[in-house]
Amino acid sequence: MGVPAFFRWLSRKYPSVIIECNENKQVDADTGRNIYEDPTLPNPNGIEFDNLYLDMNGIIHPCTHPEDKPAPKNEDEMMVAIFECIDRLFGIVRPRKLLYMAIDGVAPRAKMNQQRSRRFRAAKETTEKRLEIARIREELLSRGCKLPPEKEKGEHFDSNCITPGTPFMDRLSKCLHYFVHDRQNNNPAWKGIKVILSDANVPGEGEHKIMDYIRKQRAQPDHDPNTQHVLCGADADLIMLGLATHEPNFTIIREEFLPNKPRPCDICNGFGHEMDKCVGLGATAPTSANFKPDVPIGAEVKFIFVRLSVLREYLKQTLEMPNLPFEYSFERALDDWVFMCFFVGNDFLPHLPSLEIREGAVDRLVELYKKCVYKTRGYLTDSGDVNLDRVQLIMTDLGNAEDQIFKSRQRREEQFKARDKARKRQERNQDHGSLNQSAFGASAVGPNSQQRSVGNYKEEAAALRNRKRTSDMANLDDEDEEENNDEVRLWEDGFKDRYYESKFDVAPGNQQFRYAVALQYVRGLCWVLKYYYQGCASWNWYFPYHYAPFASDFVNIQGLSTMFEKGTKPFNPLEQLMGVFPAASSSHVPEPWAKLMSDPESPIIDFYPEDFKIDLNGKKFAWQGVALLPFVDEKRLFKALVPYYDQLTGEEVKRNKRGDNYLYISNQSPHYKKVKKISEKDDESVCKAISFDGMRGTLGKTELNTAISGVLKSPISGLSDINDNITVTTTFRDPEYDEDYIFEAKRLENAVDPPQVLPNEQSGNKHRPVIGFNSHLTRAYVPDSGHRMLNAGIRNQQGGGGNGGGGGGYGQGGGYGQGIGGNQGQSYQNNSRNYNYNYNNNYNQHQGGGYQNNYNNRQQQQYGHNQRFNQDNSNQQQRNFNNYNGPRNNNYQQQGGSRQQNQNYRRF
């Protein structure tokens, strides 16, 4: 989902959705490497999961070109990094039935336009960054600064190769094939489960291939409605896709969001400064001397669970509509909420100008939605179909508020700019003072020639920083002028005419054109909803504009046809490469085809501009802007490729074919004999329908199958061959349905909701929060003798003075912890990192039974992970729940005050 801010907004508004993953790992004292627990043991997170689905591109990208640590030296190291990441995720989730790995295949045209934009941007940014690095290096070297050697040109990894059809993706598929065999042959936790690999030759985005599998399985009569699903990926659309399944037990696992992660300077590889502030090696770069990152440098990334069952609880409260004149259905309202989120942003359509997630766009739409439901006595969507009459009402109300939305936005932006400008001036003035002191100190050096050299070097570095500071100060006003160069000015009258003239190059007042854009946008909304609920409605439809219309342009949309052409097919992998790659990435396409991207006489040379404009469109950063690239005409593209198909090598022809999913079963599986029999059939075209463990599909023979007791060679140097193989491989296809079949968006019979986490009106003060997944953990109890020991220990720490007590508790920190004087109590938690959410679960009894959350050391009255509940204002007990590991360590603390209330301990 094209909304980077969506997850941050969601985690702030609905914080109890997030919990930290528990891995039960140890660190090897000699090597410093992590030692993870045997995944055959019970899951330390208090729940056993059935199926783990990996959206592999979210793993491949950070493993091949990480932003916060040195990149792998070669492809072999990249593959090993991918293996290690899969192992770690497998160890956290510990699936007991299925592991499904899905790599992005060829995407629908609607998505290809975004992919094309990303890849052209990546090539442009790489070129510009190289030039900027060369310029800065030359400037620093001319001033005598010391620099590390330049990277060799061959060391650069082109991330654009992570696209279906490239040699890299073909090799990745072979390596994953080896990886699955290795784990099923050597790791007991893998031997009893099914593994499905959907590589880049299988059409479809990774997450949507996964959703197609889930959708088709749950439509089968023997599907378990209480299957525990875990989907790994960082895209916000995974949350929407999970909600769209209506499965009661659906969890997302993703990397913990850490803002301000330290990144090394591209010039000197140091931390604490950007490359434009670099002064080379040996000198103290600005802020680096006192650089204290929010996240420790080189810290291992942590994973979190996003519990969609808890999000459903929140949305039940958010979407509640009492006294409706018809029977209320939360499942229908949930589908409508998913649909409304598409207006804020998605990967297929630009967001409406009046809707910004940071401005409460979703809340605004929910308010308009409820008004619509009461008025029309019905919902917006039904299993992927849209009621345009009701959408028209919401768009009309939103359009009436557009003018005020734009004016309010401008006021906030002006206030922010004023504060930001004042902050920058203050920081640079402070910088100037420290630089003068540094320069003065550097001149007070003794007569030794070496010392004079060091002193002169420091003086030169200080002078260089001073010049940069002066230049920065002079550029402040220039930046303001650039930011104010907005020819549309949405906050002023006449913004519509200016918008369409500037963005679409059409004459002011051309109402017919505006209506046409709005109708295409509505068709796009219908296509996206079908994509989420039924699968791809059309492989060749796309929104043919770079910008969205205004909400007020949605007029008379009720009669628009929402049907799409049937029987469309995706591009082949190599054809897609020609549609999304810039000329700078031509090394990844067949050589005869690559000439079409650079030859001035090429009939499609206009598809590959060397330079293009990025319209900031009111944003601050280039990556937020709109890349104004020409849309690819697929008929022209295919026609231009016709003369070159017979020049493809055998390997390239193979990479250009659509493939099948692969199923892997070891001889420890109860279904081994059945699958082995299919794998040994003489005819590869013969397929057999299967049903086991609630999974249905069709299996077929594949040439990739390695004979039982045979040998599979390792494709990676340094890794062992698989000898005496015990794994069987077949092709796997999902159950087939008619093209007109409708997958109903509903709860299945016998589906059981997990224990409720949030309190409701009926629970009152009796509500007992559910920590993590397990609601049946033994409640801790402290006897009277324990209370006496606690009281005595706390009094000893306080030393008889003041009311301050703090501590680490029993399980962590050793003993009772260290007393803190005065009236301050300190819970055992690490607030050194500036999170959007805090995962330490600290529960205190709080008046009113509500919850208090800390965001970046702020307290907000919402339900959250740093949840504190107090029985009254004077209650002093705090219960720390850390290290969620089966029977939980319970750390009791005394916080402030001098009285102990033993009866409150007994409540736990």
Curated annotation (Swiss-Prot):
* Gene3D superfamilies xrefs: 1.25.40.1050, 3.40.50.12390
Query: Which biological process annotations from GO are given for this protein?
Result: mRNA processing; nuclear-transcribed mRNA catabolic process; termination of RNA polymerase II transcription
- UniProt lists compositionally biased (Polar residues) regions at 432-454
Quote the biased-composition stretches of kind Low complexity, using this chain's numbering: 825-868, 878-908
Q: Where Phosphoserine occurs, residue numbers?
A: 438
The family assignment reads: Belongs to the 5'-3' exonuclease family. XRN2/RAT1 subfamily.
Record protein name field: 5'-3' exoribonuclease 2 homolog
